From Swiss-Prot:
Similarity comment: Belongs to the BamC family.
Cell compartments where the protein resides: Cell outer membrane
UniProt keyword list: Cell outer membrane, Lipoprotein, Membrane, Palmitate, Signal
GO biological process terms, semicolon-separated: Gram-negative-bacterium-type cell outer membrane assembly; protein insertion into membrane
Lipidated residue numbers (N-palmitoyl cysteine): 20
Species lineage: Bacteria, Pseudomonadati, Pseudomonadota, Gammaproteobacteria, Alteromonadales
Lipidated sites in chain (S-diacylglycerol cysteine): 20
Region forming the signal peptide: 1-19
Physiological role: Part of the outer membrane protein assembly complex, which is involved in assembly and insertion of beta-barrel proteins into the outer membrane.
Cellular component annotations (GO), alphabetically ordered: cell outer membrane
Originating species: Pseudoalteromonas sp. (strain SM9913)
Name of the featured protein: Outer membrane protein assembly factor BamC
PROSITE patterns documented for this protein: PROKAR_LIPOPROTEIN (PS51257)
Quaternary structure and partners: Part of the Bam complex.
Any Pfam family the entry gives: Lipoprotein_18
Length: 352
């Protein structure tokens, strides 16, 4: 009845032995075996007995062993609008799509590269735009942090990079590749370090591309804010500001624009299109001049004005400015007012 016991023992031994293979070599590292300090008895008591056979030395190990670099490969940052990368691409490469407002995509990328070189106080040693290549001079892509008190004696690595632009035939997409071609430094140039440096150089250009396009978008919004205010006449022959924008669009938003120019809206007549507003000049403060937010001053006197918004025969909109008595402003005043309003639209980036 007990014949199964030896077999069961044999199986259990085999299983236990096979399970030993799952342990890594660090499982029995000496750091895992420690003995604490022996119990310290008070002076009035005797020390507990301890068998010398089982006595172990107290282990002294540093809790901060030598650091090992486990940093992952660097990533190309697709922060710029219209930028993307291909999965599993081994090169430091990014693609740019031609966004609205960019006339020549390759020129926009070249300007971004040149701006990065200027920030690093270097220039290109080789430049061939027909081949789409640029080789930089020596510079430090990674700059150590400096202390204002002690300075920094740490040696700086220097690199030279080759940037390559490849534009598709349709000129709507272009790729930019960064390649490390030379290196000076105390550290050994490993494959990981090479990849990190290349991606870092590429990301600097991507950041500059993103910054420049954001500025371009702001300029485009400012240009869109101009409603083509021109001197003209309303349907009754009075001097007025004329725009090609539709009546409903101008009438709905023009009162809000006036409030940004120190006007206080008194009345809006939806039926006649007449806006009555009080104008008071605002004194600029020191903080306004520092932050570039000085109020726009119009070439008109303080007081109440009436602005008649009307449809033109051409399908646009006319703005007839009158004083508090309902008399149309002089053509010279209208000319200065037209220039001031356009400047305000551009400065604030307002789109009516």
């Amino acid at each position: 009845m007990q014949y199964w016991i030896p077999k069961a023992l044999a199986v259990s031994v085999l299983v236990s032995l096979s399970g030993c293979s799952v342990f890594t070599s660090d499982a029995h590292n000496e750091r895992n075996y420690r003995a604490h300090e022996p119990v310290k008895a008070p002076a009035s008591l005797s020390q507990p007995a301890q068998d010398p056979v089982y006595k172990m030395d107290v282990g002294q190990y540093d809790n901060n062993p030598e650091a090992t670099n486990y940093r992952p490969p660097a990533q190309v940052l697709t922060i710029a609008k219209g930028s993307w990368v291909e999965e599993a691409d081994k090169q430091a490469r990014i693609y740019f799509d031609k966004n609205d407002g960019i006339e020549d995509l390759d020129v926009f990328i070249w300007d971004s590269i040149q701006a990065v070189l200027a920030d690093n106080n270097i220039s290109a040693t080789q430049l061939d735009k027909t081949q789409g290549t640029l080789v930089t001079d020596w510079y430090a892509i990674v700059k150590p942090e400096e202390s204002w008190l002690w300075g920094n004696d740490e040696s700086v690595d220097l690199e030279r990079f080759k940037f390559t632009i490849e534009e598709k035939e349709h000129q709507r997409t272009a790729s930019l590749t960064a390649e490390l071609i030379d290196f000076k430094g105390d550290k050994p140039l490993t494959d990981l370090l090479k990849q990190q440096l290349e991606v870092r150089a590429l990301n600097q250009v991507v950041s500059e591309f993103d910054y420049r396009y954001r500025q371009l978008e702001v300029d485009m919004r400012k240009r869109q804010g101009i409603i083509s205010l021109e001197l003209g006449f309303d349907n009754k022959g009075n001097a007025a500001l004329v725009t090609e924008q539709a009546y409903d669009t101008v009438f709905d938003r023009f009162s809000g624009f006036l409030e940004r120019l120190s006007f206080t809206i008194v009345e809006i007549n939806q039926e006649t299109g007449l806006i009555t507003a009080d104008y008071a000049k605002v004194e600029s403060s020191v903080w306004d001049s520092i932050w570039g937010d000085e109020p726009t001053e119009l070439p008109i006197d303080e007081g109440q004005y009436q602005i008649l918004v009307s449809k033109t025969k051409q399908g646009g909109t006319s703005l007839t400015w009158m004083d508090d008595k309902g008399e149309t402003l002089e053509p010279g005043t209208m000319n200065g007012l037209q220039q001031a309003l356009e400047a305000a639209l551009i400065k604030r980036g307002i789109k009516i």
